[in-house]
Amino acid sequence: MYEFKYHRPGTVRQAANLLAKNEDAKVIAGGHTLVPVMKQRLASPPHLVDLSHIEGLNEIEMKGRSLSIGATATHFEVANSAIVGEAIPALAELAGMIGDPAVRHRGTIGGSLANNDPTADYPAAVMALGATIVTNKRRLKPEEFFQGLFTTALEPDEIITKVLFPLAKKAAYVKFRNQASRYALVGVFVAKRPSDVRVAVTGAGSNGVFRLEAFEEALKKRFSHKVLDGLTVSPEGLNSDIHGSAEYRAHLIAVLARRAVEAATAKE
């Protein structure tokens, strides 16, 4: 690990100013993504701006008909929050599936979204629920925020402050995980919202999280796993690696989408 200067701002504004003044500075919260690559000397940011001590940035609360989760809320806090469990149980369940206890106690929702790992779980929930990513500068919809593998719309001095999740009538997340890393080989989040149905997939796309529009159209007519019978997913544009071929992932997506709908309807 190379030498760096550590900053511990007390407010989001102070953090943003530090990022603006220090070229190549990096934000850190839980550190589960950045610290390992720094140890391997694959990254050597001269400045680290730690958000974990900013008061209120991990707050979880209801705001009208939306669930607000602060950027530094850990996976453990999301998974075990009574507010999240009551408002969107599927989101609490998703957070409880992430990594192992050590990862869940340190990793944060904001860090996961900012990193935009193509196998991460939260992007599927954000996309399916139509959440809004709030930063110190603006509000972004999922389609604006996610811009490809490990790429987002965040500017160099822009910081995620919270995520606003609209409530869904029914929702569920199902994933087939890599047994070693527990990352999603394929993960499918299904959400029946007041106005529509959205089905989002993580872990499989060569360009990150994406939606299954054909499945959404079928489920709008009738929210039942039976309407998905006969629907398939094209392997075109899907990942193919040592963990599974594109064809295998395409099959998994269709299977998990049905299971997610079954899980969502079983909670009635």
Labelled PLM ranges:
Residues M1-E268:
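C-terminal structural segment of proteins
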